[in-house]
Regions:
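Bacterial N-terminal signal peptides that target proteins for export
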Residues: 1-7
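A Zn2+-metalloprotease active-site environment signal
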Residues: 6, 18-221
Length: 221
């Protein structure tokens, strides 16, 4: 009953949020949405998902690993560091995402493919770029098929608090929610690149990583 109520609450947040949209600016550190706005409804849904995520059996609880990844994320996030909460998830695929409320998910499959700290910084910088540009709410407002969002939210809701395959479904739902347009991906790349290079990491690291990931993707086709 709890998970069903959670799914209904998230769906209601989605539908209520579709009704209104205030003009957006890039995130300033410590920004919170206006009460009653569509963005506040999306934050509410993500806050609920985050509460359940903290109990996930897939959450990696190694303090040293979490501190290290958060440390790199904070360096690229700069003034936004205090807004971030990083969760490392034990999932073998390459993925990272960041919700508008500051929740960042980082899958261990990315660690298997990243060769050095500079590449890690580019992945994290890319996600903080999505966050500072507020791509999640922009994407939400642009979605014409609300059922796609409802399906993704229900994957999150019904996977929350469960184990095994259901938890993987939840994470798949989170990934679906934060699947952005090519223009948004390019903007996040540019924002991440500027942040990473400003911290002194190699400017070629991101291109090297994406090239390897593209080749890996081609081998699956």
């Amino acid at each position: 009953a709890t998970l069903r109520s959670f799914a209904i609450a998230m769906a209601a947040a989605l539908l209520a949020g579709c009704a209104s949209g205030a003009p957006l600016r890039d995130n300033a550190p410590g920004t919170v949405p206006t009460a009653g706005s569509d963005e506040s409804e999306l934050w509410y849904a993500m806050d609920r998902a985050e509460t359940e995520l903290r109990r996930s059996p897939l959450l990696v609880r190694d303090p040293a690993l979490n501190d290290y990844i958060r440390g790199v994320a904070c360096k690229v996030a700069g003034e936004h560091c205090k807004d971030l909460r990083v969760y490392v998830m034990d999932v073998p695929q390459f993925n990272a995402s960041m919700a508008p409320n500051g929740m960042m998910l980082f899958w261990t499959g990315a660690l298997l493919r990243i060769r050095d700290e500079a590449e890690l910084a580019f992945v994290l910088g890319h996600e903080t770029g999505h966050y500072t540009a507020r791509h999640s709410i922009r994407q939400w407002r642009r979605m014409k098929d609300a059922s796609a969002w409802l399906g993704a939210f229900q994957l999150v809701a019904y996977g929350a608090g469960a184990g095994g395959i259901a938890q993987l479904g939840m994470l798949a739902g989170m990934a679906a929610i934060f699947k952005y347009s090519r223009d948004m991906e390019r903007e996040a790349d540019a924002l991440g690149f500027d942040s990473v290079v400003a911290q002194g990491w190699a400017p070629t690291a991101g291109a090297d990583l994406w090239a390897r990931m593209w080749r890996e993707e081609q081998t699956r086709k």
